[in-house]
């Protein structure tokens, strides 16, 4: 099975060390462009663009990278409760059209009550997933070309429609990650690829089996992916030294503050990440070559595969044997590590190298009539 390898655009900051300004670098458009172009040339399938108040806006960043890349896809967040599904569907179709079919979407429900309140969202965990399920139903139906009437608990639309369809049919693939039962049910029922953070393989296997069974109960099959950091070097010793160096500037106060911030979230996945290290520096190798040091201060994905190219490739193939075909990777600093992964790891894997998409024929059309329909449909309206 050929593997889809993704990289990451660090729109929330980058540097040589975690938890300190030392060794940091400015993250501007030019730097993000360098990373995107490196990923494009090295054969990555795409890049994940993060979302939230600590990040630059993912949609604007993705749009700005379209003209400077050729085949790279952009995995961009959809934010239920923050954005309406009709607006999000128009944005998604436009991004897909402008990129010639290089748009992918990542459903992000949010987990920090403080950040969500700042965005005007005052829903608890279960309510957010209810809203996300309704959002996704409307979003998918619009991209499928339906005119949608929907009267849910959280979302109400009447006569919603898209005039401009996406390039990818039936619609751009939808990714999603969540560890709670309600999150896995949403994944099983509506998404195309279920993402998990990089837990030990036996825990990931358990997750995949649960989601696969839930999807089968809905008559569906979905794909699987994992989100990991990578520290790959020419030798295993060099890789472990690089891992220790990454957290060498961390102090106990910074770790404690970070863990306190994570504790206020209601994310089951974040709780599972924190339990891998319990905020302590010792015993961070939680599974062969799987290191939890990143999660001491970084929210979300908090583990890294550490080793030389053949060793890390062997661990990736262990995940692939569970049914995972997509790996969303990152490393610090992201420009240098994109090259290291491409040069030291990719030769030991069966990597699916994406082709440059060919321009799609678009039917000519005049200006929309009365902001409601396109001219070629006048006779049917």
Curated annotation (Swiss-Prot):
InterPro entries attached to this UniProt entry: Alkanesulphonate_mOase_FMN-dep, Luciferase-like_dom, Luciferase-like_sf, SsuD_RutA_monooxygenase
Membrane spanning stretches: none
One GO biological process term: alkanesulfonate catabolic process
Reactions mediated catalytically: an alkanesulfonate + FMNH2 + O2 = an aldehyde + FMN + sulfite + H2O + 2 H(+)
GO molecular function: alkanesulfonate monooxygenase activity
Record-listed E.C. numbers: 1.14.14.5
The keyword Oxidoreductase is annotated on this UniProt entry: yes
Entry keywords, A to Z: Flavoprotein, FMN, Monooxygenase, Oxidoreductase
Name of the top EC class for this enzyme: oxidoreductase
SUPFAM superfamilies: Bacterial luciferase-like
HAMAP family according to UniProt: Alkanesulf_monooxygen
Note: FMNH(2) which is absolutely required for this enzymatic reaction, is provided by SsuE.
UniProt similarity note: Belongs to the SsuD family.
Biological role: Catalyzes the desulfonation of aliphatic sulfonates.
Subunit text: Homotetramer.
Full protein name: Alkanesulfonate monooxygenase
Record lineage: Bacteria, Pseudomonadati, Pseudomonadota, Gammaproteobacteria, Enterobacterales
Name of the encoding gene: ssuD
């Amino acid at each position: 099975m050929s593997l889809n390898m993704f990289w990451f655009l660090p729109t929330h900051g980058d540097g040589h060390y975690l938890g300190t300004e030392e060794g940091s670098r400015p993250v501007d458009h030019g730097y993000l462009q360098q990373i995107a172009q490196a990923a494009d040339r090295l054969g990555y399938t795409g890049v994940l663009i993060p979302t939230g108040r600590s990040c630059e806006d993912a949609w604007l960043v993705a749009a700005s990278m379209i003209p400077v890349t050729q085949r790279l896809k952009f995995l961009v967040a959809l934010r239920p409760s923050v954005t309406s599904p009709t607006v999000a569907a128009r944005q998604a179709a436009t991004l897909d059209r402008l990129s010639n079919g290089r748009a992918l979407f990542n459903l992000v429900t949010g987990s920090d009550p403080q950040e969500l309140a700042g965005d005007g969202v005052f829903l608890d965990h279960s309510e957010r997933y209810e809203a996300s399920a309704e959002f996704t139903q409307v979003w998918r139906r619009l991209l499928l070309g339906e005119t949608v009437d929907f009267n849910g608990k959280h979302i109400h639309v009447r006569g919603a429609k898209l005039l401009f369809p996406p390039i990818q049919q039936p619609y751009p693939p939808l990714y999603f990650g969540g560890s709670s039962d309600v999150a896995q049910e949403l994944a099983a029922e509506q998404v195309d690829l279920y993402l998990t953070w990089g837990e030990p393989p036996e825990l990931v296997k358990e997750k995949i089996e649960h989601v696969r069974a839930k999807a089968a109960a809905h008559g569906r099959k979905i794909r699987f992916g994992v989100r990991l950091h990578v520290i790959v070097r020419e030798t295993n010793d060099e890789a472990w030294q690089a891992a220790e160096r990454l957290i060498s500037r961390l102090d106990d106060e910074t770790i404690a503050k970070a863990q306190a911030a994570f504790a206020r979230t209601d994310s089951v996945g974040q709780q599972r990440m924190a339990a891998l290290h319990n905020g302590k520096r010792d015993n961070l190798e939680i599974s062969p070559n799987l290191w939890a040091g990143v999660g001491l201060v970084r929210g979300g994905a908090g583990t890294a595969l550490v080793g030389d190219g053949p060793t890390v490739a062997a661990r990736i193939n262990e995940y692939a044997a569970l049914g995972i075909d997509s790996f969303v990777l990152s490393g610090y600093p992201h420009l240098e590590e994109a090259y290291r992964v491409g040069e030291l790891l990719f030769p030991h894997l069966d990597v699916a190298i994406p082709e440059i998409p060919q321009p799609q024929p678009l039917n000519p059309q005049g200006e929309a009539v009365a902001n409601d329909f396109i001219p070629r449909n006048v006779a049917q309206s």
